[in-house]
Design a protein with these regions (language model features):
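Intrinsically disordered, low-structural-confidence terminal and linker regions
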Residues: 1-32
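Active-site-surrounding "flap" and adjacent substrate/cofactor-binding loops of secreted or lumenal enzymes
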Residues: 154-170
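Conserved N-terminal beta1-alpha1 strand-loop-helix module at the mouth
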Residues: 62-63, 69, 113-116
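Subunit-assembly interface segments of extracellular/virion macromolecular structures
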Residues: 66, 77-80
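Conserved alpha/beta-domain cores
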Residues: 23-35, 41-55, 59, 82-100, ...
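Long, compositionally biased, charged low-complexity segments
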Residues: 4-11, 78, 515, 556-559
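Surface-exposed peri-terminal alpha-helical interaction modules
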Residues: 68-69, 467
Length: 561
């Protein structure tokens, strides 16, 4: 271990240490929304809580700015000079040293079979039902499944505060005696909390959510052996893991928590991060609860970063993109292999089915069979668990992982893959070949449009064709639309190519169908249509759809008034 520490010092694997606290910060916080009860606002945004958020934001402002500068520089390098992700030569010693492991998991995290995913904390009833579902954990989601209006965010943190203490109650229903774990997913680094400024700078959404949760709930969760546990979204490399490690260590000292008590599962949702998984685990080795596959965000990151390259043109995702596709199967295999080498939990993606809203022709039994079959393959590959959205899927999916674990225990695991860098580097960047149909264009338009429409209403998810759609699936949908328009992709079942005119036509079609299916205010429909057309055709598309939508905050407020 001393050798590894020397190597890390030599290559500068970690960012500089944060400055010591000192001096009072200049803090601005937006006023309470009229729909937010005063006691909720006061409980979350107490003077002491705001002081802690401000201190954390001020202490780490330079590192956060460096993070964004690194991201911008890499995107420029990728766009203009054709840079591609690769295993870092300067970190080879850490990857090849088989002696280091992450710290052992606390008792509460020994069973990771099923978490409920995409649970917006602003949805009080869903949060309570998820806690009482029998799952091992609840992904309390301030990111992909959450629309971060000021009202939603404050209510979300209030609900988490109550849930952590077993006080959450809805219509007489209370938290059961042994609820699922609260595993908080703060916003990703691309999102800001625009309603709080410290020293004239907007507080990163990631720091706001993390600091609020740890300040209000960290010590209580630790003392009850229920946390504090996190999911970390959209990291783009090990330097960002190093930043989180520093934030954890700083917070543990400030709140008088034991070193290493904060545990985090990193969501591998970025093409650059998949080449740095060993390094990510190493940086977080005292705080790690493993890695998780985030399939659609990961796939979208490939399309967004390499959107102009013909060899990175992604076909119809409904037909050609799944965990059976080579580039995703080897992504999962490498994640599991990396975790097993480092004694870290490895979990896989979310089953999106909403059983009560399946389309005609698909029975609940068929959906459950499809879910358990896919998770069975992942379990045999070495996954320790997965996520589901529908609470009725908890038991069948948990049973799959239990049975596969017992089967592997009796028979022994098959020969593991060898960590062959050249092999994985090729497979991870070899995308499937296939065509695009009118149906696939319409499906992407539908998902993007309905997601944006519900975002304008203040919701972070929407059900489409029996599946929950969040920002991850909206991300891949809009990214593919842009890529298909840019490359003027031919349509297999029509004598035309994908262009702006077709996108406009599809938007009108889907909009008309949606207005007949469910009443909507016309101004919301029109705003959603214009936003999806813009993000599908603009010269410089944003890195994240949520950043683009957050920038429309003034539009959202004007619609509501």
């Amino acid at each position: 271990m001393e050798r590894i520490n020397r190597l890390r010092a030599q290559v500068g694997a970690s960012a500089a240490s944060p400055p010591p606290p000192g001096g009072s910060a200049d803090v601005f916080v937006s006023l309470r929304d009229a729909s937010c009860p005063q006691h909720v606002y006061d409980a979350v945004l107490s003077p002491a809580a705001l002081e802690f958020v401000a201190e954390l934001a001020a202490a780490f402002q330079p590192q956060v700015e460096q993070l964004h500068a690194r991201r911008q520089a890499r995107r420029l390098e990728t766009e203009q000079h054709g840079a591609m992700p690769h295993f870092l030569e300067e970190m080879r010693a850490i990857r090849e040293d088989e002696t280091w492991r992450i710290d052992p998991q606390p008792r509460a995290l020994m069973d990771r079979r099923v978490d409920i995913g995409d649970v917006s904390p602003a949805n009080r009833e869903l949060l309570l039902r998820a806690l009482n579902s029998g799952a091992q954990g609840v992904q309390v989601d301030f990111d992909d499944g959450h629309c971060p209006t000021w009202n939603n965010t404050i209510k979300g943190h209030f609900n988490v505060l109550q849930a952590a203490r077993g006080l959450l109650e809805v219509s007489g229903q209370q938290v059961v005696e042994n609820p699922a774990l609260l595993v908080i997913r703060p916003r990703a680094w691309n999102m800001d909390e625009s309603h709080m400024l410290v020293n004239g700078r907007v507080v990163p959404g990631a720091l706001f959510d993390f600091a609020m949760h740890l300040f209000h709930n960290g010590k209580h969760l630790f003392e009850t052996e229920m946390g504090p546990f996190l999911y970390l979204p959209k990291l783009e490399g090990y330097t960002e893991a190093a930043l989180w490690r520093q934030i954890f260590e700083y917070t543990e000292k400030m709140l008088d928590l034991p070193h290493g008590c904060i545990k985090a599962t990193v969501l591998i949702e970025n093409i650059f991060a998949v080449f740095e998984m060993d390094e990510i685990l190493y940086e977080l080795r005292h705080h790690s609860s493993g890695l998780n596959c985030g399939m659609w965000d990961y796939t979208a990151s490939i399309v967004v970063n390499f959107r102009k390259r013909p060899e990175c043109l992604l076909p119809d995702r409904q037909q050609y993109v799944s965990m059976k596709s080579d580039f995703l199967r080897y992504y999962m295999d490498l994640l599991i292999l990396t975790c097993k080498r480092r004694h870290a939990p490895a979990t896989t993606g979310m089953v999106p089915f909403v059983l009560s809203e399946l389309p005609t022709g698909i029975s609940q039994a068929e959906a459950i069979e499809k879910a358990t079959s896919s998770k069975g393959v992942e379990a045999l590959a070495g996954s320790d668990g997965a996520l589901v959205y529908d609470l009725a899927l908890v038991e069948p999916v948990a049973t799959v992982f239990t049975e596969k674990r017992e089967k592997i225990g009796k028979a022994g695991r098959s020969a593991p893959l060898v960590f062959d860098e050249a092999f994985f580097a090729e497979k991870l960047l070899t995308l499937p070949r296939g065509d695009v149909t009118l149906k696939s264009v319409e499906m992407n338009v539908r998902v993007a449009l309905l997601y944006v429409l519900h975002w304008l209403y203040g919701n972070g998810t929407v059900v489409v064709n029996g599946c929950i759609e969040d920002s991850a699936t909206a991300e891949i949908s809009r990214a593919q639309l842009w890529q298909w328009v840019y490359h003027r992709v031919p349509i297999a079942d029509a004598s035309q190519r994908v262009d702006a005119a077709l996108i406009a036509e599809m938007l009108r079609k889907v909009l008309h169908e949606e207005s007949k299916r469910k009443p909507h205010q016309p101004q919301y429909l029109e705003a959603a249509r214009q936003l999806v057309f813009l993000i599908s055709t603009m010269r410089f598309p944003p890195a994240f759809i949520t950043t683009f939508l957050q920038d429309q905050e003034a539009l959202v407020e004007s619609l509501q008034h």
